[in-house]
């Protein structure tokens, strides 16, 4: 009979097979009430599942990360229960857990409305209040098929077809509603009170736009209502920071139907863009990169040789001229290899670092477009390092150091680094993969910072390093990458003369720091809520007069600041000074300079910050020094 070993090392003996719930009850009534599931010998199981032999057991409660995932998964099933009660002809598809929530894909003859979502949420709350038990039954495959046939659940039957080796399946019964899942799930609906449905969107069966359209109901669920309230507050703050809203408020950019996924940059937004580009140009030049420019439109022959035509053609914009097919480039790498291939290269020429602010276009589905975060036309801070295998470690280490420096300059200090390693389907020998992964791992170790492996997540031809930034709302943004690639040089016949006078293939390191300028600017807008650090702000200082008598001196101050390289403008309107200050504070200008008679007389400016801090009156030259210091700090939080 089983001996159960608990996480603290204590043991409990039972004279019969025992369920997880029974073990919890033997420890205490409070734990039994909080038990969601168990982890038996490291494997998650339902609270009702029995343990028949000696095992280790961890009781899972809402406080555990696994517990939160179970709550969310069970909430997805609860969506199904409510939908089938309200809309019996709806057909249920899948309901997985996602970051901070869940969704359920549903086929229904008409689009769900916000009123439908409110009704579904209300029915879910009514079902929770019934406090019913969720019943698990392991059921033979044939019976599962018969059950879903009788209920007309066509998509469930298709999913069963995808699992030919499953002889028995877990069915979870929410009263009359039944769903199929590996589990585990909550034992009772009382655990599901802290939830909220968030939105409805479209989706496609199996994610393929050629298939029938489904409707996706999203929701979030938490261990308790306090956590849910904190999440809702965070989402509300994110909505206030939405780059689309702030972009309009600050007159940065717009998008319109005639050019879906293409950005119309206004002067203010283009100013931010130009600062980014000039900064990255200098950073890359200082680190040994040479800048190049390659064509926008390239014959399909090159894309066929690179492999992109067979794997990526549907995402490429194409055109034809004089009986030749062309594609607008979706990436820069094949073109950079063409530059490398011009002229004979020696090992003495390596490493060669080619950088390009490459304008790329990808035919993203219209439903996937999102402001300037997900677009069809974008510019990358793209570069490719051509080097020998022996140079990979140093190049990777230098790139990591540079990338972290750039992120700190933009105000991001919480950075996760991950190494994606060999997938099951890959090219190249294990020895080559060992060396490539080892070089990147050694480079990461040299940074002195924590990093983690992502096993099996590398490209089929090589490992890669990913950089993920955390913003002020705790959201993660995957930005920089360093991809090891021996494949493209082979396909495009790149070579150099090695020290032994033989031809060898270079290793190609694809790398980007910001990723796309458009997406990175969107991130900056939301991270700073539009209140850019002085070095990025479209207007760094606005000079305001109190009466017409100060207009000439205000214009003189703007001229002096402009000649010093600052972005300043005047506001000489016949409006009250309080009105002007409020307006430019809302426009998030870092410094507000007020000029009255006293300032004209002393050749000074009265300085306020957009946060409302009064810095007092100072000579124009002193303010210029203050602004120069603010600009030199960039977005750093320290005095580096």
Curated annotation (Swiss-Prot):
Cofactor requirement: Zn(2+)
Keyword RNA-binding: yes
Annotated residues for binding of Zn(2+): 333, 384, 510
Molecular-function GO terms, alphabetical: ATP binding; metal ion binding; threonine-tRNA ligase activity; tRNA binding
CDD domains: TGS_ThrRS, ThrRS_anticodon, ThrRS_core
Main location: cytoplasm
Function: Catalyzes the attachment of threonine to tRNA(Thr) in a two-step reaction: L-threonine is first activated by ATP to form Thr-AMP and then transferred to the acceptor end of tRNA(Thr). Also edits incorrectly charged L-seryl-tRNA(Thr).
GO cellular component, one term: cytosol
Enzymatic class: ligase
Entries under PANTHER family matching the protein: THREONINE--TRNA LIGASE, CHLOROPLASTIC_MITOCHONDRIAL 2, THREONINE-TRNA LIGASE
Lineage start: Bacteria, Pseudomonadati, Pseudomonadota, Gammaproteobacteria, Pseudomonadales
Pfam families referenced in this protein's UniProt entry, alphabetically: HGTP_anticodon (PF03129), TGS (PF02824), tRNA-synt_2b (PF00587), tRNA_SAD (PF07973)
Alphabetical UniProt keywords: Aminoacyl-tRNA synthetase, ATP-binding, Cytoplasm, Ligase, Metal-binding, Nucleotide-binding, Protein biosynthesis, RNA-binding, tRNA-binding, Zinc
Protein name from the UniProt record: Threonine--tRNA ligase
């Amino acid at each position: 009979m089983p001996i159960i070993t608990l996480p603290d090392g204590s043991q409990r003996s039972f004279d019969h097979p025992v369920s997880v719930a029974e073990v919890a009850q033997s420890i205490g009534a409070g734990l039994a009430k909080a038990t969601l599931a168990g982890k038996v010998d490291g494997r998650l199981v339902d609270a009702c599942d029995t343990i028949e032999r000696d095992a280790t057991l961890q009781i899972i409660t809402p406080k555990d990360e696994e517990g939160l995932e179970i709550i969310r998964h069970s909430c997805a099933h609860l969506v199904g229960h409510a939908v089938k009660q309200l809309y019996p002809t709806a057909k249920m598809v899948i309901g997985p857990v996602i970051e901070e929530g869940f969704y359920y894909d549903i086929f229904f003859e008409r689009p769900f409305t916000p009123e439908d979502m409110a009704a579904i949420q209300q029915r879910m709350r009514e079902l929770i209040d019934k406090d019913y038990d969720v019943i698990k039954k392991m059921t033979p495959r044939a019976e599962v098929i018969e059950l879903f046939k009788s209920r007309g659940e066509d998509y469930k039957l298709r999913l069963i077809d995808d699992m030919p080796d499953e002889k028995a399946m877990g069915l979870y019964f929410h009263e009359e509603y039944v769903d199929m899942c590996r589990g585990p799930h909550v034992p009772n609906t009382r655990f599901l009170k802290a939830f909220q449905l968030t939105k409805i969107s479209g989706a496609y069966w199996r994610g393929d736009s050629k298939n029938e359209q489904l409707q996706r109901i999203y929701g979030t669920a938490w261990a308790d209502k306090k956590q849910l309230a904190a999440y809702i507050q965070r989402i509300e703050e994110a909505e206030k920071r939405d780059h689309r809203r702030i972009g309009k408020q600050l007159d940065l950019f717009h998008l319109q139907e005639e050019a879906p996924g293409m950005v119309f940059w206004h002067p203010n937004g283009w100013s931010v863009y130009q600062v980014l580009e000039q900064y990255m140009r200098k950073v890359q030049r200082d680190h040994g990169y040479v800048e190049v420019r390659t064509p926008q439109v390239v014959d399909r022959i090159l894309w066929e040789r690179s492999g992109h035509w067979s794997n990526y053609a549907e995402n490429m914009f194409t055109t034809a001229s004089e009986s030749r097919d062309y594609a607008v480039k979706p990436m820069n790498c094949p073109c950079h290899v063409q530059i490398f291939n011009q002229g004979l290269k020696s090992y003495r020429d390596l490493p060669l670092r080619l950088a390009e602010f490459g304008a790329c276009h990808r035919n993203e589905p219209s439903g996937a477009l999102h402001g300037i975060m997900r677009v069809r036309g974008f510019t990358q801070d793209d570069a490719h390092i051509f080097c020998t295998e022996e140079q990979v470690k140093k190049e990777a280490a230098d790139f990591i150091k540079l990338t972290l420096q750039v992120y700190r300059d933009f105000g991001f200090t919480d950075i996760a680094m991950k190494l994606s390693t060999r997938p099951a389907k890959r090219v190249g020998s294990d020895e080559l993969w060992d060396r490539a992964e080892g070089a990147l791992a050694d480079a990461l170790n040299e940074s002195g910072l924590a990093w983690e492996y992502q096993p099996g997540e590398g490209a089929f031809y090589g490992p890669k390093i990913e950089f993920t930034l955390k913003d002020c709302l705790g959201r993660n943004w995957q930005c920089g990458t360093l991809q090891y690639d021996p494949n493209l040089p082979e396909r495009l016949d790149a070579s150099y003369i090695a020290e032994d006078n033989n031809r060898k293939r270079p290793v190609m390191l694809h790398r980007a720091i910001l990723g796309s300028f458009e997406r990175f600017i969107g991130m900056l807008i939301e991270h700073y809520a539009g209140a850019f650090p002085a070095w990025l702000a479209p207007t760094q200082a606005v000079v305001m007069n109190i009466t017409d008598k100060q207009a000439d001196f205000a214009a003189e101050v703007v001229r002096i600041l402009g000649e010093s390289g600052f972005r300043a403008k005047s506001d000489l309107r016949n409006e009250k000074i309080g009105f002007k200050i409020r307006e430019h504070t809302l426009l998030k200008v870092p410094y507000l300079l007020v000029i009255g008679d006293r300032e004209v007389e002393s050749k000074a400016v009265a300085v306020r910050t957009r946060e409302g801090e009064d810095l007092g009156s100072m000579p124009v030259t002193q303010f210029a020094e203050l602004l120069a210091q603010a600009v030199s700090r960039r977005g750093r939080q320290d005095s580096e």
